[in-house]
């Protein structure tokens, strides 16, 4: 990891007038982050899968902070939709100051997308990785923030087996692997894209819709000991708005503090292999 430089994105004045893209913006952490950055004066760009919830959050942001944000629908379980989203965003915005790659999910049983990938690694990692690559030029001088989790310690990343075909499926391990991939990708992006401040973060255990339709859903939605979505989004919003000189590009953060990683997650050589494997998987090797 290398120290960040002050030209990366946000000055001390906050997010006023900055373009902030939030994926997974229709519920939970993404929704809370969108509302928070809008209150700081950002031009918010929402991305979500469900059109009704997307309209609801669009209206909530407009009521909170004035003008309605831009909203784009895309299902990250289909890479074709992600590519189309990338084209639309490139056409619309000459610059994106912050990309908060937050879309994610948990799948209780093994699910394969129409692209041929295990759904957890595609929705939580590969789709966001592809979108960041498609927006590479728009992110120059800006920030890339990847939502991760301390569940990364349960991950078993293998660049030669992104689908985890060599092991019996475990929802928890698949989720942890996807979050491990995000930490490693932020670190590798910092090495490959020096003009982008790339970081990942752990939001804490948050009351969200994750795991909907599974036995885990009630735990994540109703457990009184879990954090609120607003609290879970706090580090994301801080990473988007803090002075660049206070942050470390490539770093993994928890509760606004740089948090060390170890083992395979800290292996730069493995991260480079993951980057190349991901690029080949999504069919984009230009960056």
UniProtKB/Swiss-Prot annotation:
Sites where the protein binds substrate: 149
Record's keyword terms, sorted: NAD, NADP, Oxidoreductase
SUPFAM superfamilies: NAD(P)-binding Rossmann-fold domains (SSF51735)
Official protein name in the record: Putative daunorubicin C-13 ketoreductase DnrU
Residues annotated to bind NADP(+): 24-30
Alphabetized SMART domains for the sequence: PKS_KR
Top-level lineage group: Bacteria
InterPro entries, A to Z: NAD(P)-bd_dom_sf, SDR_fam
Similarity comment text for this entry: Belongs to the short-chain dehydrogenases/reductases (SDR) family.
Keyword NADP: yes
Species: Streptomyces peucetius
Active-site residue list: 175
